Amino acid sequence: MKFVYGIHGYGRGHATRSLSILQQLEGHDILVMAGGDAYDLLEPLGYDMFRIPTLAYVYGKRKDRFSMWLSFKHMAPMLWDIFTRGKDYGRIKKRISDFKPDAVINDSEPWTGRSANNLGIPLISVDHYAVLSYGDWDMPGKLKKQLGTTTRIYRFYLGKPDRIIGSAFYPAKPTDSRATLVGPIIRKEVREADITEGDHLLVYFNNQHFFTPEIEKRLTELDVEVHAFVQKIPEDHHNIRFFRSDNCTFVREISSCRSIITSAGNQLAGEALFLRKPMLIVPEASTEQQMNSWAVQNMGVGLETDLDQLASDGFVKEFLERENEFRSRITPFSRDYSPDVAREI
């Protein structure tokens, strides 16, 4: 069969989840449409790629909160292109039409989803946000209220899927007859990794603004080795070693670490649970990440925090002292659902 796979390019989570499915669909003819971080991660792996724009948040002076104005200013021309079927929409739609796929698979990517609807091609949505938009699970009332607006935006700009597959590391029940909800989708490299409990603490933030001088200072005060993934590599100093976020290095480091300090992306949290790694989780200012961080703490597999608390004296040490407590609760959640998703497709 022939598939177009549209992948949202902001951060690595959409790309790593999609990579898991692409690996399950080997032997099929697939055109991958992606931009940003997703394109950078997948293009070296040899997939047939077509670069498209990426909607992304822009951060201002506040390190823990994206700027509404700067983000809108950045995304407005792209949103206008989507809704008016502008130049980028036209070239993406034409490439899909020329490829003649049997279906379009979509991970939170608006141009490919709306093009599929316009061309009358079956649309299969495979992402995390479907769990929030087409699922029901226990959550605080404040987050549930915030979710209503976010869900309406998500459904509006992504198109109308014929089939919905949602993935999350926490349990949820579908509220739509088109929807199937599963647990974490794990890429092949993580599934096959040797899981060890090493001595180093892994630090990875999707938003590099989170790695502030104050947090770096606190990490240097720890009596453990820290392996930090950053975009611009400084020289190693004190107990911190810096790495660039390539696929092989990241899998090696996460599978052998003792625990993780990270932002609250659903995909990384799912991989951490599969590898039985406790998490100290710092959400970005989005409803989805706040829900993920709440779920981590509610499940008892880690702690949620913010940048100020993370930079405070003794907080990371407290987390490290409770590692075994968190790790003991992880085993029931360690399963890979990528074969289930491939069967659904």
Task: Place the predicted regions along the sequence by residue.
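A short, glycine/small-residue-rich beta-strand->loop->alpha-helix junction that serves as a flexible
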Residues: Y5-L19
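Conserved nucleotide-sugar phosphate-binding/catalytic loop shared by glycosyltransferases and other
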Residues: H8-G9, H28-I82
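Conserved nucleotide-sugar donor-binding subdomain of glycosyltransferases
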Residues: M68-A103
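Leloir-type glycosyltransferase catalytic cores
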Residues: H74-M78, F156-G166, Y170-K173, V301-I345
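Donor-nucleotide binding loops and adjacent catalytic segments primarily
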Residues: G183-S259
